[in-house]
């Protein structure tokens, strides 16, 4: 029986230009793939889901990846509760930019750890891959966060990425509300790798969604 309490989660999708942030977001919200590349300045989407028997209202902010919009980043970083750090497995530069985004988030939040998931997108383009899965796992391990590879085009692990970020936020909030428990959050890294499901599947997901 799902809880009737509606909790809103402010999720922010961050990454360089052209890595597929909008495609991931629209695939989650509207269940279709956008072929054309139209650089985003800032778009916000809302969707109601049930994740692990708890109702969640996802407020997803799709952000600009272009450098000329970098001044806007700190504003949405202040309000975000969790971040998907997205790079393309076909772009070494986009992978290297992830470190900068992560450091900026921690600086703005003034935290040593904050709910983040590293996302290697476009895993359907394996023949064009220039960033190995092991490199993504290693970076996530360095951050003390989870790692997942996705494909917006093939709908691989799209829901998993967003749902697991909600789970990380819940875990983080629980840890912060109980500081006398197991110690400082982030002392142990979560499992850094999640299984990549087949197209159309939602491995590990316990949820259903309603577009708002």
From Swiss-Prot:
One of the GO biological process terms: regulation of conidium formation
Reported regulation of activity: Alternates between an inactive form bound to GDP and an active form bound to GTP. Activated by a guanine nucleotide-exchange factor (GEF) and inactivated by a GTPase-activating protein (GAP).
Residues reported in the UniProt entry to bind GTP: 15-22, 62-66, 121-124
A Pfam family annotated for this UniProt entry: Ras
GO cellular component: plasma membrane
Short motif Effector region, span: 37-45
Subcellular location: Cell membrane
Lipid-acceptor residues (S-geranylgeranyl cysteine): 209
Modified residues (Cysteine methyl ester): 209
EC top class named in words: hydrolase
Cystine connections: none
Record flagged with keyword DNA damage: no
Lipid anchor positions (S-palmitoyl cysteine): 205-206
Propeptide, residue positions: 210-212
Topology within the bilayer: Lipid-anchor
GO molecular function, one term: G protein activity
Reactions catalysed, as given in the entry: GTP + H2O = GDP + phosphate + H(+)
EC number(s) reported in the record: 3.6.5.2
InterPro entries assigned: P-loop_NTPase, Small_GTP-bd, Small_GTPase, Small_GTPase_Ras-type
Keywords in alphabetical order: Cell membrane, GTP-binding, Hydrolase, Lipoprotein, Membrane, Methylation, Nucleotide-binding, Palmitate, Prenylation
PROSITE patterns in the cross-refs: RAS (PS51421)
Family: Belongs to the small GTPase superfamily. Ras family.
Name this protein carries in UniProt: Ras-like protein
Species annotation: Emericella nidulans (strain FGSC A4 / ATCC 38163 / CBS 112.46 / NRRL 194 / M139)
Gene assigned in the entry: rasA
